[in-house]
Structure formats: C-alpha cells, structure tokens
C-alpha cells in the first residue's frame, strides 16, 4: 500500500555520493516543497569514485572533472542543502533527530527529520597488523585520498609501489602507476586477482598484468610493514619482505555502519544494514542505500554485499520514490561489472561457476573463443567467454568475458538475458545487430547459445580442464588432438596423439570404437567437428571446453603462481 506523503516533509540524507546524491535529486523532482538536507563527511559530493585511479595516473588531468556536482551547483539546480565536512555522529530514532559535527568549526548540533536516508558507503578494510599507520601507506576511497596520493607522488617521485589487494581498485591503480613509470607489485593472500571471476578466467587477467610489467605475488600473506631505507618493507609470512617507496592498501571495503549499529538498526552479513525491497530498514522512517546495505543476489536469492555504483544509484532512486509516496521495489543485484586492464577488458555478470557450486547449484559451463567481429574484416580480436548455466533447467546464471574488443557489448547482452530470466539455450535466438566491423552474423552470444543447445540436445558432450589430469593414460581411453601437425609440435597435453581434423575420416581405422574418445583442438571448434565425425561413425566422444589455448593459458599461470618467487617479484 502506498503511504500518504507530506509536501512539506523534511528529509535528511547521510552521505552525498552515489546513492545519497541520487536520492536527493529524485526527491526534489518528485516533491518541490520538501526540505532536503545532505550531510557529507568529506569535502566533496557526487564525485566519480571510479575515476580516482585515473587522476593519479594523469589520464584525467583536471581535478574538477572528478566532481560531478558541487554543493553550490546542486543547490542551484535542486534546492538541496548540501553540507560538506559535516559528520553525523549519532541517530536518535525516537526523537527523529541526528547529531551532527561541523568538522571545520567543531560545532555540534541536532538536526530533525521526517525521513532519514543512510548512504554512508563503505570504508577501506584496514588489516590489524603492525605498521598500518606509516606515512608511506595509503588507502584510496575518497577525493581527499586521491589528492593525498597524487601530492605524494608529485613531491617524492617514488620509483616503486606495492599494492596490497587485487580487486578493482588494486588493478586500476597498478595500471596507472605503471603508466607513470613505477615498478609495481601486487601482493595478496588469494591465488587469483578479481574474485568475481573464476580462477581459470582470472588467468588471462594475470597474463595481461605480467605482460605490462606488473609483478604478482599471489598466495602470500602480508603480516606487517616496517620503514627502511626511506621506503617500506612489506613483511610476508614465510617469505622475504618486499621493499617499495610506497604502499597502497586495496584489500577491499567494509560497510560503514557504525551509525546504524549504534541506532539499533538490524544488521546482516559483515555488519551491513538489513533492508527490505523498498530500501526500508528495521526502524520506521529510516531508509538505507548503497555499499552499506545487504541485498538479495538476483541469481541465487541469497543475501549479498555488492559494492557497485549502479546498484547504489538504483537504490537511491527507489528509496526516494517510496519516501514520496510511490511503491518502488529493488529486485536484487547481479554484480555486473567491467574493468580496463591496460589493453584488455574484463567483465562479468551474475554468478561465477565457483560461487554457484558453493550455493549448491548443479551447473555446467561452455567456454569459447570467438572473434570480436567478422574474421575477414581487419582488426578483429579474440575474446574468451565463459557462460554458466544450471544443468537441470538450463537457466542462465552468469558469464565472464576477457578480450580486447567488444567485451562490454557482450556482457551487457548477457546481463540483460539473466535479468529477463532467459535460459542459456535461448541465447541463440537473440536478434543482435550485425555488420562486419562490429560483429559476426553469428554473434559470440549466439554462439554460446548454440553450444548450450547442442548440450541440451545431446549433440555435444564436454570434458573440462579439471578432468585433464584425471584422464587415464593406460590406453583405456583415446586422447586425441585434432590440430595441425605444426600446432601439435608447438605444445600439447601429455598422453594425447595427433590426427588433424581434416585427415580424421581417412584415419578412423587408427581408433578403437570400444574406447571413449577425448578430443581437443586450439579453440574448441575443430574438436567439435571431429566429435561429430566420430559420433557419426559410432564413437563415444567428448569435446574439451575452451581448447588448448585456454588450457595453456590457465596451466602456465598456475605454474607461475606456485613458483617459489612468485612471478619474479623483487626481494628486499
């Protein structure tokens, strides 16, 4: 039921970046008479968080480009009172007031509200280890953090940096610091960068980072920091320390929910604020949006923390609608994201294979390496796609793509398909725009659908990377590589023998029909053709998902990660 709303109500918003600023503007568009007050602890409102690493790297050169609005411009357009450098220190739900401190003057006062929106965001995770307060250690979350790092670089001209953490901020900083000419090492406990990706797909990200000179120390635990020789030693468990001129902590973020906890709001996973689908908290007239709130994962239905700008903006709009008498509902987050990694683009949506299995879903995947556009048109680039679907229903669950062109377009199509509840088999039916410079007549998304349909119809049976070492080498199965003789000589999986696909029909007599045949080629296409030839001649055959290109990239990356001096990282 829609609530009745008061034209002259007073709305107080805590936090003036993505969710808070969106809510303020939406309320004004719906209600010209409401009094709207926003308190922002930093000195900036509505700033571009995602652009901060690019200012450090001189890609964005004008500081003013980081701020989408100023308090003055926001008031001029929306008549919203934006109070920067003001920290809300307490919420009093029974009195419907908040305690506020002016960080410039020290003045403290009480502000009343009819409706309250919490948009406090998240704070950088600070490990409880020695040395985190050193002057040469930095975090990056706000414009002030950015200016602090930028000023340090300009004044001291550091030649090396260690980044603790391999998520979005860590990778974007690594690229930008490398572009400034610095030696860069990423160190973290997990053995892969970018947790939204499966480890196999993350291998392509690792390779791109190494190609551009970023050293990776994966699977290493940071135990502390010490000053030495004008720089910082990064102390590692069971390893020699790393030495650098500066260190940036980018190990993740935690919900900023101290206010909510002290006010008695219900909290969820990792201390996040529990809200319903109207963005209402457990206390009447208090709403919460953005990185601090617990949401439902759209694919799994489980509680999740998804810190992304898109969901925060949508949530701010929904809270505003409901405050102004509407009945808007948040249907969940699916974690659609994209990142630039030097020349590569990596993108993901939905749930990856690893997390899908952890939630108890019985899933399968297809992996393919299509061209970004028609192969005969110059400039096409190979991308690697992994599509995750539920075995029993073929429900589309997620996708990951890495490549150098056309990645963002395909991930957005797949994200839309997930939101629409499509089955993976129906991807073949999508009517997508085609011209040789932009795509192929059978778009990569269509190709993924064709592959899943072949599985559903029994035309295609697959074997996967994790099966490679488990396949018997005792002659009980046939291990067949259908690439050219030259490709096979350049590298192949131990135990496989070579019959090029174009010679297969003439050489069927070399194979035993009583044995299952496990087939591989470079990308998966020729081996699929070989499987159809074999099946048509009475063989039981299985096609390798991803091809030797995929196998080689992943296994080489795993060897580098496990090496004693991870990827050649510098020692102290």
Where are these regions (language model features)?
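A Rossmann-like FAD-binding core segment of flavoenzymes
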Residues: 33-35, 77, 83-104, 111, ...
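Mid-to-C-terminal Rossmann-like scaffold of FAD/NAD(P)H-dependent oxidoreductases
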Residues: 4-9, 16, 292-404, 436-440, ...
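Rossmann-like dinucleotide-binding cores of NAD(P)H-dependent redox enzymes
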Residues: 67, 160-161, 168-226, 306-312, ...
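Rhodanese-like catalytic fold shared by cysteine-dependent sulfurtransferases
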Residues: 425-477, 485-516, 522-572
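FAD-site-proximal beta/loop scaffold in flavoenzymes
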Residues: 133-157, 233-235, 241-318, 413, ...
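N-terminal Rossmann-like dinucleotide/flavin-binding domain of flavoprotein oxidoreductases
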Residues: 26-115, 198-215, 220, 353-358, ...
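Beta1-alpha1 glycine-rich phosphate/pyrophosphate-binding loop at the start
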Residues: 5-85, 174-197, 336, 409-418, ...
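Glycine-rich dinucleotide-binding loop and its adjacent helix/turn
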Residues: 118-180, 215, 269, 275-277, ...
């Amino acid at each position: 039921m829609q609530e009745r709303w008061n034209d002259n109500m007073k709305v107080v918003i805590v936090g003036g970046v993505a969710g808070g600023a969106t809510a303020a503007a939406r309320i004004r568009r719906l209600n010209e008479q409401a009094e709207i007050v926003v308190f922002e602890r930093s000195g900036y409102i509505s700033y571009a968080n995602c652009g901060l690493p690019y200012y450090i790297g001189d890609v964005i050169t004008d500081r003013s480009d980081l701020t989408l609005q100023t308090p003055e411009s926001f008031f001029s357009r929306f008549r919203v009172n934006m109070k920067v450098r003001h920290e809300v220190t307490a919420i009093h739900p029974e009195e419907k007031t908040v305690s506020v401190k002016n960080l410039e003057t020290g003045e403290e006062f009480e502000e009343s509200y009819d409706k309250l929106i919490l948009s406090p965001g998240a704070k950088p995770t600070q490990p409880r280890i020695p040395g985190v307060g050193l002057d040469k250690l930095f975090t990056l979350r706000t414009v002030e953090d950015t200016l602090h790092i930028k000023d340090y670089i300009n004044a001291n001209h550091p030649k090396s940096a260690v980044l603790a953490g391999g998520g979005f901020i860590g990778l974007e900083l690594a690229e930008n610091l490398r572009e400034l000419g610095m030696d860069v090492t990423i160190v973290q406990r997990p053995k892969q960068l970018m947790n939204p990706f499966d480890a196999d797909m993350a291998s392509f990200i690792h390779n791109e980072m190494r190609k551009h000179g970023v050293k990776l120390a994966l699977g290493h635990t940071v135990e502390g920091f010490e000053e030495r020789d004008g720089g910082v030693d990064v102390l590692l468990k069971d390893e020699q320390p790393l030495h650098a001129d500066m260190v940036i902590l980018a190990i993740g973020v935690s919900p900023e929910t101290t206010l909510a906890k002290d006010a008695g709001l219900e909290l969820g996973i990792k201390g996040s604020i529990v809200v319903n689908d109207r963005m209402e908290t457990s206390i009447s007239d208090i709403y919460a949006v953005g990185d601090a709130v617990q949401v439902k994962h759209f694919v799994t239905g489980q509680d999740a923390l998804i810190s992304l700008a898109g969901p925060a903006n949508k949530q701010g709009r929904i809270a505003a609608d409901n405050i102004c008498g509407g009945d808007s509902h948040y249907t969940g987050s699916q974690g659609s994201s994209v990142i630039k990694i030097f020349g590569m683009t990596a993108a993901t949506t939905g749930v990856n294979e690893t997390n899908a299995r952890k939630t108890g879903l019985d899933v399968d995947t297809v992996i393919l390496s299509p061209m970004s556009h028609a192969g005969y048109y110059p400039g096409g680039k190979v991308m690697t796609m992994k599509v995750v679907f539920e075995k029993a229903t073929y429900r589309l669950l997620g996708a990951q793509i890495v490549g150098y062109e056309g990645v963002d377009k395909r991930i957005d199509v797949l994200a839309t398909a997930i939101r629409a509840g499509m089955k993976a088999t129906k991807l073949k039916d999508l009517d997508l725009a085609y011209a040789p410079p932009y795509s192929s007549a059978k778009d990569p998304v269509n190709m993924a659908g064709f592959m899943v349909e072949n599985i559903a119809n029994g035309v295609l049976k697959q074997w996967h990377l994790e099966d490679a070492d488990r396949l018997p080498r005792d002659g009980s199965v046939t291990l067949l590589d259908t690439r050219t003789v030259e490709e096979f000589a350049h590298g192949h999986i131990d135990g496989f023998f070579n019959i090029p696909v174009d010679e297969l029909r003439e050489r069927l007599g070399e194979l035993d029909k009583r044995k299952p045949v496990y087939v591989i080629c470079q990308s998966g296409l020729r081996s699929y053709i070989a499987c159809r030839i074999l099946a048509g001649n009475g063989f039981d055959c299985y096609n390798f998902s991803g091809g030797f290109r995929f196998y080689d990239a992943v296994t080489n990356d795993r060897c580098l990660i496990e090496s004693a001096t991870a990827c050649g990282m510098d020692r102290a």
